[in-house]
């Protein structure tokens, strides 16, 4: 099923603070993705933390890792059975997240 928290995204207009915190305090490599996003990595993954320069300081999304496609399908079915609408993301979104495939749903708080 889920093997790891792969990445997380936040909305914040305090990108300089995030650069200092993640870069200096956590030792993450800063990756300028252009546009409104700044990404950070700490290992061989393309990105682990993505900060979108938007008003507020809120969680935008979490990216969960699964071992195989079948696990993602099982997870989607469980979420649907629990009343959460699951959406198959398009390839453009998957590419922006540096993943092969992607589904998403909203949590009770709307994230």
Where are these regions (language model features)?
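Vicinal oxygen chelate
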Residues: 4-13, 54-80, 82-111
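Core segments of cupin and vicinal oxygen chelate
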Residues: 7-47
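Short hydrophobic alpha-helix segments
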Residues: 34, 63, 89-90
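Short acidic/glycine-enriched loop/turn segments that link adjacent beta-strands
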Residues: 34-37, 58, 96-99
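Active-site beta-strand termini and strand-to-loop segments that position acidic
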Residues: 40-45, 53-54, 105-108
